[in-house]
Every structure is written in C-alpha cells, then in structure tokens.
Design a protein with these regions (language model features):
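C-terminal alpha-helical "lid" subdomain
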Residues: 177, 205-278
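Conserved NTP-binding/hydrolysis module of P-loop NTPases
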Residues: 11-13, 70-72, 81-100
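Sensor-1/coupling segment of RecA-like P-loop NTPase cores
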Residues: 47-52, 58, 105-109, 133-138, ...
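Short regulatory helix/loop adjacent to the ATP-binding pocket of P-loop NTPases
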Residues: 62-66, 166-181, 190
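A short, basic N-terminal segment
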Residues: 1-42, 275-278
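Conserved AAA+ ATPase "SRH/arginine-finger" region at the nucleotide-binding site
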Residues: 76-80, 169-170, 183-196
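Walker A/P-loop nucleotide-binding motif
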Residues: 41-63, 79
Length: 278
C-alpha cells in the first residue's frame, strides 16, 4: 500500500524470514560463524537458540546461502511429527527416492544415501527449526541418526534450532547421551541499542526501488529510542513497529516518522496484543 509512495520495491519490514534482508549484527554474525564452523569441521550436533523473533530462521536461511557447494541440506521447519513422519520428511527433503515405509527401511535408505554422498565428497546437513517442539523420543531419533558415521567423519551434521525451552528439553536425564554429543552451541541475543538504527536503515536500503536515489524515509532519534525501548532489540518487534509507522506516515503524507507516530503505533500493537489475549 505504501511502497509506491515511499519509492520502495517491497515492504522492508515484513516479518518473514527473507535472507535478502539479513543484517550482520554482532550476534547474528557470531551465530553464522558457529554454524559454518560446526558444519565445516563435521562436529555432528549443533544447537542454536534464541527468543521468539530474534532471527533464528533468517540466520538459517542466510547460512544456507553461505555454505560451499559440497554441502547438501534438508530443512525441517515444523517438526510436530511422529518418528516415522520425521524420517519421511528428512528422506523427502534430501531428495531420496525411498519405497520403504518402515522406520528401519528409511534409516537404511538414508544411511546408503549418506555413504554415497560422503564418497562423492559431500557434507550432509539436517536443520530442524522449532526444535523445542520435538518430544524426547524424536530427539533420541535425531541422536541415532547422528551416529551414522565412517571411521573418520560424521555422515550427517544436525543443527537443532529453537527457543530457550530447547535447552530445558535437552537437559532431561533421558537425553544425556544426546547432550554429550552437542559440540557447538550458540544463543542469539537481541540487537544492541546502537545497532537498531543501522538495522532499520539497512532494511530500508534493501527495499529501495531506485538505488541511486537517497532514502527519503527518516525516523527521528526520539522515534528510534522509543522503538529500542519497546522492542528490547528484538528484530520481529522492530519490524512490526516500523511497518505500522510507514503505513501511518503514508496516511499522514509524511516521510518523517517522529516520536508521536511511533507512540501511536506501539499503543496500537499493545491494544491488539491485549485483545488477542483477552
């Protein structure tokens, strides 16, 4: 609605996990470095955690664009499965043609595939997002898959991505064998206050239709400060506020987004949140 008014080719503050908008904050870059290290060194199991809206899925999608050509991946987004369904999803996402419908048969087909890919010099990575939703039995299944190996290397690298509750799940006594196999961990924190203005301007720059024209959208310093306080540095909340602010600016026919506009947008978001929870 407001894109043409502001000279934008797309909405800069969508809450979807678009890697084109990846912002290299200190913590996000550290997260990418941990993932690249864990995969390249074939560490086996890697755990990436962060609160809701901190950019975990965006980091994973950006990571997929950074890995070398010999890295092949399967990306499971919502693992609310049974053990059989999880295996079916992994086999399907790796592009494996399997006529087996039993758990043992699919593991056999997966192992054969991993061995062939290893001989070809490829590194296979399984990413499971929202892994805090995995029941203990499924996490044990993941551990067993991570056991697939040659004399020298792990055949499958596993990245578990989830909210902090994932750590609580992994600390269960029955999952102690899995916990001992986690070789790389990283927790994504919020953006620093000084990064928030850079983050906003970065997304506006990516979305700008004419790169040779100066960005005509201006958030005042007071507006940025209020966004920082309300969002506590959480990218998703920053996006929600800024998207509403651009709409409010469009309705008011202004490119200058000040404290008053941001205050109204935050009040609307708070009101909506209260209504949702009523």
């Amino acid at each position: 609605m407001y894109c043409q008014y502001y000279g934008l080719k797309e909405r800069p503050f969508n809450v979807t996990s678009d890697p084109a908008f990846f912002f290299s904050s200190k913590k996000h870059q550290e997260a990418i470095s941990h993932l690249l290290y864990g995969v390249s060194q074939r560490k086996g199991i890697i755990v990436l955690t962060g609160e809701i809206g901190t950019g975990k899925t965006t980091i994973c999608r950006f990571f997929l664009n950074q890995v070398s050509k010999n890295v092949k991946t399967a990306f499971i987004l919502n693992p609310a499965f049974s053990e059989i369904q999880l295996l079916e999803s992994i086999v399907r996402d790796f592009g494996i043609t399997s006529k087996n419908k039993t758990k043992l048969g699919m593991v056999w087909d997966l192992n054969s595939f991993l061995l062939r890919e290893s001989v070809a010099g490829n590194n296979l990575v399984l990413i499971i997002d929202e892994a805090q939703n995995l029941k203990p039995g499924l996490l044990e299944q993941v551990r067993l898959l991570s056991n697939l190996e040659t004399e020298k290397d792990k055949l499958l690298q596993v990245i578990l991505v989830g909210q902090p509750e994932l750590n609580n799940r992994l600390n269960l006594y029955d999952l102690r064998q899995l916990r001992q196999r986690i070789m790389v961990r990283y927790h994504i924190g919020p953006l620093e206050n000084e990064e928030i203005k850079l983050y906003i301007n970065h997304r506006l720059e990516i979305a700008r239709a004419e790169k040779n024209l100066e960005n005509n959208i201006k958030f005042s310093d007071e507006a940025i400060d209020m966004i920082a306080r309300f969002s506590a540095g959480t990218p998703r909340l920053i996006n929600m506020i800024c998207d509403r602010a651009l709409l409010a600016g469009f309705v008011s026919e202004t490119n200058h987004l000040d404290f008053g506009i941001i205050k109204r947008c935050i009040e609307e978001l708070d009101s909506y949140s209260v209504g949702q929870n009523a």
